[in-house]
Amino acid sequence: MNQLDALRQMTVVVADTGDIDAIKAYQPEDATTNPSLVLSASALPQYAPLIDEAIAYAKAKSNDKAQQLIDAEDKLAVNIGLEILKVVKGRISTEVDARYSYDTEKTIAKARKLIALYNEAGISNDRILIKIASTWQGIKAAEQLEKEGINCNLTLLFSQAQARACAEAGVYLISPFVGRILDWYKANSDKKEYAPAEDPGVVSVTSIYNYYKQHGYNTVVMGASFRNAGEITELAGCDRLTIAPALLKELQESEAPLVRKLEYKGEVKARPAPMTEAEFYWEHNQDPMAVEKLAEGIRKFAIDQEKLEAMLLAKF
């Protein structure tokens, strides 16, 4: 049995891509997108009609150019999601504009709009996850959205404080990053090579997984952002793992044995009192890696959102 099939027996495999052909090839349960993946998918020729349709939709909705652009980018993200939902049995994750990462109300409004666009296309809420950056404001937005029956995927998660706040807010799923944590440690320390078991990203996700299971939180842990297959195999047993096509291919081509690494069998402990905003910032800011990577991730997604807007504007 190849490693991908072995992994499927213990972990829900998710494709981290907007490329329909790649998704068809590996038959994941779910798929995740982000502004960077939407931007790269938009360059694929088969997506040209989706862009044209999004622009036509936006022009019909408003005469204001700025509003048309907002409507077109939202509709395009949903159009790509709709195509992906034709080939996955489970859920699509669609991300809120990263520029709203520190604005709870705008995040809630954008999430409701994206859900409405999916609903108009006949897709029920149980097939969608709204992706939101794991800022305090994003977590508070998700807490409200969950109460409305809108499930959320909290992304750009690098610290234990972020993970704890997400669980306490009752969010459906978190995406703790692995590879970007490794990147930071390689760039900021003398150690340049890590065995998979001691990879700081693997250690972080393992710690979060165990904390959730120890305290009986139902929030799904979906490891994300992988730099090599060793990080993935070291997290076998995690609730879900979202994996880029190149690494799905590598796993599929490997016949090496796969051992379950994550499985909590201990007793469930009492949960601590929920964190306050002050406690969240204090604990999160104790981790310079998490502070830098959260800010950088938001900036990068915002830059790609702006590139997407420029691409759309050129087609108006």
Swiss-Prot record:
Catalytic activity: D-sedoheptulose 7-phosphate + D-glyceraldehyde 3-phosphate = D-erythrose 4-phosphate + beta-D-fructose 6-phosphate
PROSITE patterns associated with the record: TRANSALDOLASE_1 (PS01054), TRANSALDOLASE_2 (PS00958)
Pathway terms, separated by semicolons: Carbohydrate degradation; pentose phosphate pathway; D-glyceraldehyde 3-phosphate and beta-D-fructose 6-phosphate from D-ribose 5-phosphate and D-xylulose 5-phosphate (non-oxidative stage): step 2/3
Keywords assigned by UniProt, alphabetized: Cytoplasm, Pentose shunt, Schiff base, Transferase
InterPro entries: Aldolase_TIM, TAL/FSA, Transaldolase_1, Transaldolase_AS
Residue positions of the active site: 131 (schiff-base intermediate with substrate)
Protein family according to the UniProt entry: Belongs to the transaldolase family. Type 1 subfamily.
Functional description taken from the UniProt entry: Transaldolase is important for the balance of metabolites in the pentose-phosphate pathway.
Record protein name field: Transaldolase
